[in-house]
């Protein structure tokens, strides 16, 4: 498939916590959409291997959430480290989107970008410096149009691919119910 500079790269990662200095990436997923938010391609979801010492250091919320979803077991069983995960995701992106053209898209995406800058810097460098953060619209709708904000249904599975799909659906909801698109 040819690269398209108008495609959007949606990314989500699950981490062992919120601090890039001490926590690590344990799952990564990427979805490519066209500019109208239609899915073009999905990368294989990667559980990123981390040693037991990293997993044992997770706080209770992360232990429970990632344990219940099965992610902790998938991370332990994975043979793919951070460098290999980064290389696989870069190879996927090179098929679909030219470097430096797509903003990093997602929900609270700056958090993912912080981890990526530290642990997957080549992947982070593929993106445009801008972010398309759905949480910005969420915060505005919450304050300006609460009925639109309340219309978003989220399951909050904290699984990378499911979270991306929810973010895309959420942006569609805001596009259709909050933003006025005049031709």
From Swiss-Prot:
Show the SMART domains listed in the entry: EXOIII
* Gene Ontology MF terms: 3'-5'-RNA exonuclease activity; nucleic acid binding
* Pfam families attached to this UniProt entry: RNase_T
Q: State which Enzyme Commission number(s) the record gives.
A: 3.1.15.-
Q: Which terms does the UniProt entry file under GO BP? A: DNA metabolic process
| SUPFAM superfamilies associated with the record | Ribonuclease H-like (SSF53098)
**Among its keywords, does the record have NAD?**
no
Coiled-coil stretches are none
First-tier enzyme category under EC: hydrolase
Per the record, GO CC terms? cytoplasm
Keywords in alphabetical order, please.
Answer: Cytoplasm, Exonuclease, Hydrolase, Nuclease
Catalytic residues, chain numbering? 129
The cross-references to PANTHER family, in alphabetical order and at most eight, read:
OLIGORIBONUCLEASE, MITOCHONDRIAL
Q: Which family does it belong to?
A: Belongs to the oligoribonuclease family.
Among HAMAP family, the record links this protein to:
Oligoribonuclease (MF_00045)
Q: What is the protein's name according to its record?
A: Oligoribonuclease
The record lists the organism as Aromatoleum aromaticum (strain DSM 19018 / LMG 30748 / EbN1)
